[in-house]
């Protein structure tokens, strides 16, 4: 029998009464709207379907403060203490949002999906409060350190106020990917009941699974005479993780390796916080709501990596210890596990702590696996399954087949456009991949025709972000991208790089065409510098707007001293050193 929901009742808020649905939908049309962020969208979906039971909305200040300080909701209705809930679930807004939307206690506002404008729910505002972000970071993530991705998100993306209140569901967010693998808690519980699964061991993952993971989950199931729920996160995970499309195809390739009827694959639309011990307790609560009776917690569960001092944010077994601390209230049995290692002599996997001293073992680290994928080197059968490796190779081809972006930055007339065109011809001669040329002025007029010569600093930043998005998408598709905007600001170049690295896989190179201003003015046949000095053009970089020279360029060149062929050759040598050409 499936485990009881956290708090005793599954808070499935999804409306099933047609008349009520129509009434709420009609009301939503008359209300002001909050368009949700990707994280808020994930949170709302799990509020609506009961995955976050006993929550019925976004946390008010009383619950938020209690969760941050005590890992519990505030006590209600005579409770001695509230239910365990270790992560604050909040809806952030700005002062401008409050003013524009007329947000106030008792007011109602529609929550919309930014992807299709669909009204998902109506929130009744219980309170509006300003959180102490430093305390939230210290208490929840363990440190106010922006090396932690959730602290960086809190500091850089989360607005200054939180709005608390219960929600009334109109509909769940619509998904078009892997629909047969998406189950609400009620649906998954019904599925377990249909299969007569009395004990279910849930396995949380945000990474592809290989033989060690399969052996680990099978061992856990056998020891407890249970079945296995493979429950990977397909919402927001750690930046740089394998995309969920690739991961789900890899999970599907792995599933036939389980004995018939032992395991089930279902997807979880969770926005992870990478909060280590607190996150492990949160994951246990969520899996309990989905009907699991057991939950696997491993070494450094949901850890984000290193802090600013190069140390781990959490101890290796802090997560297991915190889940154990709350085991009586969680009512879901934790299955602790050590890392698994391969024994070549017996062709089997064993937990590291059970291997006799001196026994030969073999392992492939994540770094080594990425290297083998990048270079096309073999991946042994003892490490993974043929189908899983095939999926990973399709998504992560070897370096000569990967896309890349070269950003040439410099003043107008520095020669960057000439270098870009010459490099384009050279790469096209070599073949093997398409080559796209993104020149700053041409793209500016194409992407935003309203921007003329009088471009403001903020427009320059936005323009480069747009070019970065295009470059990232082309890079992801395997193209060679040469971008040559002025790109005068460091923050803009970093935003551009983030677009390429995040979307395109990290093959990004910066070339600073450092030809000085006096030379650029001397060869300015179009008269832009002359017009700027006469006041006819505003914010021309180098005249009345700053150019911030990059300090991290892969190549610095100057057309006074270097010829275009020499510069192109130097760029090609950089690409060759990375096995990209």
Swiss-Prot record:
Subcellular compartments: Cytoplasm
Domain of life: Eukaryota
GO-annotated cellular components: cytoplasm
Pfam families cross-referenced by the UniProt entry: APS_kinase (PF01583), ATP-sulfurylase (PF01747), PUA_2 (PF14306)
Root EC class: transferase
InterPro entries per record: APS_kinase, ATP-Sase_PUA-like_dom, P-loop_NTPase, PUA-like_sf, Rossmann-like_a/b/a_fold, Sulf_adenylyltr_euk, Sulf_AdTrans/APS_kinase, Sulfurylase_cat_dom
Pathway annotation: Sulfur metabolism; hydrogen sulfide biosynthesis; sulfite from sulfate: step 1/3
Active-site residues, record numbering mapped to chain: 205-207
Catalytic activity: sulfate + ATP + H(+) = adenosine 5'-phosphosulfate + diphosphate
Signal peptide: none
Coiled-coil ranges (or none): none
One GO MF term: sulfate adenylyltransferase (ATP) activity
Residues marked Induces change in substrate recognition on ATP binding (site): 337
Region N-terminal, annotated ranges: 1-176
Binding site for ATP: 204-207, 298-301, 340
Record region (Allosteric regulation domain): 402-581
Gene Ontology biological process terms in this record: cysteine biosynthetic process; hydrogen sulfide biosynthetic process; methionine biosynthetic process; sulfate assimilation via adenylyl sulfate reduction; sulfate assimilation, phosphoadenylyl sulfate reduction by phosphoadenylyl-sulfate reductase (thioredoxin)
UniProt keyword Nucleotide-binding, yes or no: yes
Region (Catalytic): 177-401
Annotated site (Transition state stabilizer): 210, 213
Free-text note on domains in this protein's UniProt record: The adenylyl-sulfate kinase (APS kinase) is non-functional. It is involved in allosteric regulation by PAPS. PAPS binding induces a large rotational rearrangement of domains lowering the substrate affinity of the enzyme.
Functional summary from the UniProt entry: Catalyzes the first intracellular reaction of sulfate assimilation, forming adenosine-5'-phosphosulfate (APS) from inorganic sulfate and ATP. Plays an important role in sulfate activation as a component of the biosynthesis pathway of sulfur-containing amino acids.
Subunit structure: Homohexamer. Dimer of trimers.
Protein name: Sulfate adenylyltransferase
Gene label: MET3
């Amino acid at each position: 029998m499936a485990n009881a929901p956290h708090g005793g009742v599954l808070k499935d808020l999804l409306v099933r009464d047609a008349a009520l649905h129509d009434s709420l939908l009609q009301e939503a049309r008359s209300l002001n709207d909050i368009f949700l962020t990707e994280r808020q969208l994930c949170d709302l979906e799990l509020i609506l379907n009961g995955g976050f039971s006993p929550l019925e909305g976004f946390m008010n200040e009383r619950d938020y403060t209690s969760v941050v300080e005590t890992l519990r909701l505030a006590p209600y209705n005579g409770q001695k203490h509230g239910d365990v809930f270790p992560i604050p679930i909040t809806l952030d807004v700005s002062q401008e949002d409050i003013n524009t939307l007329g947000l106030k206690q008792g007011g109602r506002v529609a929550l919309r999906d930014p992807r299709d404008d669909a009204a998902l729910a109506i929130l009744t505002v219980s309170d509006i409060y300003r959180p102490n972000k430093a305390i939230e970071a210290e208490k929840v993530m363990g440190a106010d350190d922006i090396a932690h991705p959730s602290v960086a998100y809190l500091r850089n993306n989360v607005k200054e106020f939180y709005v608390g209140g219960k929600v009334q569901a109109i509909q769940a967010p619509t998904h078009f990917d892997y629909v047969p693998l998406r189950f609400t808690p009620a649906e998954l519980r019904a599925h377990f009941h249909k299969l007569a699964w009395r004990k279910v061991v849930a396995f949380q993952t945000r990474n592809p699974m290989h033989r060690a993971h399969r052996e680990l989950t099978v061992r856990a199931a056998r020891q407890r005479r249970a079945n296995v729920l493979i429950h990977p996160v397909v919402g927001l995970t750690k930046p740089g993780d394998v995309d969920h499309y690739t991961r789900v195809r890899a999970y599907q390739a792995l599933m036939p390796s389980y004995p018939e009827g032992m395991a089930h694959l279902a997807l979880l639309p969770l926005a992870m916080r990478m909060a280590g011990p607190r996150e492990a307790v949160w994951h246990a609560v969520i899996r309990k709501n989905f009907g699991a009776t057991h939950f696997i917690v491993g070494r450094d569960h949901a850890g984000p990596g290193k802090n600013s001092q190069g140390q781990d944010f959490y101890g290796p077994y802090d997560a297991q210890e915190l889940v154990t601390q709350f085991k009586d209230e969680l009512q879901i049995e934790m299955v602790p596990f050590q890392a698994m290692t391969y024994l070549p002599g017996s062709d089997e996997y064993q937990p590291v702590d059970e291997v006799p001293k001196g026994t030969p073992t073999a392992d492939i680290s994540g770094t080594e696996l990425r290297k083998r994928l990048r270079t096309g080197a073999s991946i042994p059968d003892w490490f993974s399954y043929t189908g899983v490796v095939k999926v990973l190779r399709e998504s992560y081809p070897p370096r000569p087949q990967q896309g890349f972006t070269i950003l040439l930055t410099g003043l107008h007339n520095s020669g960057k456009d000439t270098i870009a065109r010459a490099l384009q011809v050279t790469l096209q001669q070599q073949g093997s991949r398409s080559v796209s040329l993104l020149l700053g002025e041409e793209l500016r007029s194409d992407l935003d025709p309203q921007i003329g010569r009088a471009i403001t600093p903020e427009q320059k930043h936005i323009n480069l972000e747009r070019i970065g998005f295009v470059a990232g998408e082309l890079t992801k598709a395997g193209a060679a991208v040469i971008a040559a905007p002025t790109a005068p600001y460091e923050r803009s170049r970093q935003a551009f790089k983030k677009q390429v690295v995040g979307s395109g896989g990290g093959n990004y190179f910066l070339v600073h065409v450092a030809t000085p201003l006096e030379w650029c003015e001397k060869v300015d046949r179009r008269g832009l510098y002359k017009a700027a000095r006469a006041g006819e053009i505003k914010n021309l970089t180098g005249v009345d707007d700053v150019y911030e020279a990059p300090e991290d360029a892969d190549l610095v060149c100057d057309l006074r001293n270097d010829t275009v062929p020499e510069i192109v050759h130097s760029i090609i040598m950089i690409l060759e050193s990375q096995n990209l050409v």
